[in-house]
């Protein structure tokens, strides 16, 4: 009986520690392994590059000085690198309770909390997206830039993606929660759902917090109070970029992105539509309602954020 609940991880490699933690915690957090998949992949890349097996005690300030630039060179945003860092430190802290020895500098890492590519849309832009007639105006190929005629099934897909994005702007939820909506989530003009990521229950009074309640109810009724689009999030973002590319206009503006690491600032230029994703809808909801002077407590109750610090990262003011 005692052996059943004892755990000695003193000889485990870092990836073995991750596997063991995910195995144990998956009983209460079924999707935890998916959350750590990127970390495992990047650690395996490092092991392959240097021909070694990474042990927990090898994670030090020296390791971080190599690992962070390595992730940046692979094209990861600093917000994503920060997520990888947090996951790795969480694994080390958990493993240390079961015999794993840590280097004293295992958590001495500074990933810039500095990224200026956050995008929030205005109410006019959201309305423009909703009212854009897909296939009725000259449409250019997403890749070859030649004028083309969209097929009926492609038009239907882009319409569903458009409605899904606009609905996200009006309800302020993550994509993983929007795909799960059903009539049971709506009662007396209020939307509520237990969020998949946090387990928090949020409440959105549609008439007072949605960006446009008329459009919100029109979309909901069109799809029987279910999600307009339920495909893979990567496909969703690809279709969203294609939709915004077809709309053109303000979404084709150049945006300069400044990133800072190890004291060096680098700048890259992208078109605005390339920076808009599923999460931009949630940012737009938070930013617009903040600018409307809606009480912060009501917005947090709608977005499900448990702290103002976490919520503030969603706000994109004019200078951003």
PLM feature segments, named:
Residues 42-45, 74-106, 140, 174, ...:
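N-terminal DNA-binding recognition helix of tyrosine site-specific recombinases/integrases
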Residues 3, 10-42, 73-75:
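Short, aromatic/basic-rich helix-turn unit that serves as a nucleic-acid recognition element
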Residues 111, 146-154, 176, 187-225, ...:
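Basic, Lys/Arg-rich DNA-contacting stretches centered on the C-terminal catalytic core
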């Amino acid at each position: 009986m005692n052996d059943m609940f004892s755990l000695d991880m003193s000889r485990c490699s870092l990836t073995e520690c991750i596997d063991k933690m995910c195995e144990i915690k998956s009983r209460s957090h079924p999707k935890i392994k998916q959350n750590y998949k990127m970390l495992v992949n990047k650690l395996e890349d490092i092991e392959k590059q240097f021909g070694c097996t990474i042990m927990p005690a090898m994670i030090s300030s020296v390791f971080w000085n190599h690992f962070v630039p390595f992730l940046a060179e692979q094209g990861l945003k600093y917000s994503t690198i920060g997520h990888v860092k947090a996951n790795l430190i969480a694994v080390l802290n958990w493993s240390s309770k079961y015999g794993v020895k840590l280097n004293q500098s295992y958590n001495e890492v500074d990933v810039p909390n500095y990224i200026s590519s956050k995008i929030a849309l205005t109410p006019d832009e959201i309305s423009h997206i909703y009212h854009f007639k897909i296939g009725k105006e000259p449409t250019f190929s997403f890749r070859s830039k030649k004028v083309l005629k969209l097929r009926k099934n492609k038009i239907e897909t882009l319409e569903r993606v458009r409605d899904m994005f606009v609905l996200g702007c009006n309800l302020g939820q993550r994509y993983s929660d929007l795909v799960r909506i059903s009539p049971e989530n709506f009662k007396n003009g209020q939307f509520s759902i237990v969020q998949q990521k946090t387990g928090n229950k949020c409440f959105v009074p549609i008439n007072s917090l949605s960006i446009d309640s008329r459009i919100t109810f029109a979309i909901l009724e069109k799809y029987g109070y279910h999600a307009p689009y339920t495909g893979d999030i990567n496909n969703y973002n690809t279709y969203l970029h294609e939709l915004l590319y077809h709309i053109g206009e303000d979404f084709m503006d150049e945006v300069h992105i400044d990133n800072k690491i190890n004291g060096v600032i680098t700048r890259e230029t992208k078109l605005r539509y390339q920076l808009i994703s599923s999460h931009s809808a949630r940012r737009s909801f938070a930013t617009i309602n903040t600018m409307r002077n809606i009480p912060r407590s009501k917005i947090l109750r709608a977005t499900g954020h448990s702290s103002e610090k976490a919520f503030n990262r969603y706000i994109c003011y004019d200078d951003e």
